[in-house]
Amino acid sequence: MEKLTKRQQDILDFIKLKVQEKGYPPSVREIGQAVGLASSSTVHGHLSRLEEKGYIRRDPTKPRAIEILGEDRMDTETQSVIQVPIVGKVTAGLPITAVESVEEHFPLPASIVAGADQVFMLRISGDSMIEAGIFDGDLVVVRQQQSAYNGEIVVALTEDNEATVKRFYKEKDHFRLQPENSSLEPIILKQVSVIGKVIGVYRDLH
């Protein structure tokens, strides 16, 4: 199969994660929120390229009909599970100091968290990301990386070494950490350290 771009891989990973969690694929809107794309037409474009490259098949008459093909299909049926560490707690409202101790581990499909030593989970406390579908008490799946594209949801350390989950923007002479809550103001910083990118969300419905 033809190699995927980083964005296409992120979208494919998110689709596989949702199929594993729910038994059916995510909506275009959910995909856009997960990978930091505001335009549904841009998401459709990436899905078309995934289809052209043979990774997925879509039914144009059904909005959620995304079938994973080839080896990736087997990954969603029978695969190994990796115990991903849940690391402390990060506030999605007012930033709190990042806790580096591992509280527990959470099982996730190996295909979703390729490079398990670079993936961790954090529990959200606060309501600043509710418009991105991330709520108080959710667990976010984070891939460790030190850079991000504008619009991606990241775990970042502020100038005061505080950890927070926000949408990332690098602007002319500063960084903007944007909450997904219209009642809250962005955090404007001269310096920021990206810890990782949020690639998925887990919510207990009980």
Swiss-Prot record:
Site (Cleavage): A92, G93
Coiled coil spans: none
GO cellular component: protein-DNA complex
GO molecular function list: DNA-binding transcription repressor activity; sequence-specific DNA binding; serine-type endopeptidase activity
GO BP, one annotated term: DNA replication
UniProt KW keywords: Autocatalytic cleavage, DNA damage, DNA repair, DNA replication, DNA-binding, Hydrolase, Repressor, SOS response, Transcription, Transcription regulation
Database matches in SUPFAM superfamilies: LexA/Signal peptidase (SSF51306), Winged helix' DNA-binding domain (SSF46785)
A Pfam family the protein falls into: LexA_DNA_bind
Catalytic center residues: S128 (for autocatalytic cleavage activity), K166 (for autocatalytic cleavage activity)
Residues of the DNA-binding region: 28-48
InterPro entries reported for this sequence: ArsR-like_HTH (IPR011991), LexA (IPR006200), LexA-like (IPR039418), LexA/Signal_pep-like_sf (IPR036286), LexA_DNA-bd_dom (IPR006199), LexA_repressor (IPR050077), Peptidase_S24_LexA (IPR006197), Peptidase_S24_S26A/B/C (IPR015927)
EC number: 3.4.21.88
Catalytic reaction list: Hydrolysis of Ala-|-Gly bond in repressor LexA
EC primary class: hydrolase
PANTHER family hit by this protein: LEXA REPRESSOR, LEXA REPRESSOR-RELATED
Biological role: Represses a number of genes involved in the response to DNA damage (SOS response), including recA and lexA. In the presence of single-stranded DNA, RecA interacts with LexA causing an autocatalytic cleavage which disrupts the DNA-binding part of LexA, leading to derepression of the SOS regulon and eventually DNA repair.
Family per similarity comment: Belongs to the peptidase S24 family.
Subunit structure: Homodimer.
Record-given protein name: LexA repressor
Species name: Bacillus cereus (strain ATCC 14579 / DSM 31 / CCUG 7414 / JCM 2152 / NBRC 15305 / NCIMB 9373 / NCTC 2599 / NRRL B-3711)
Annotated gene: lexA
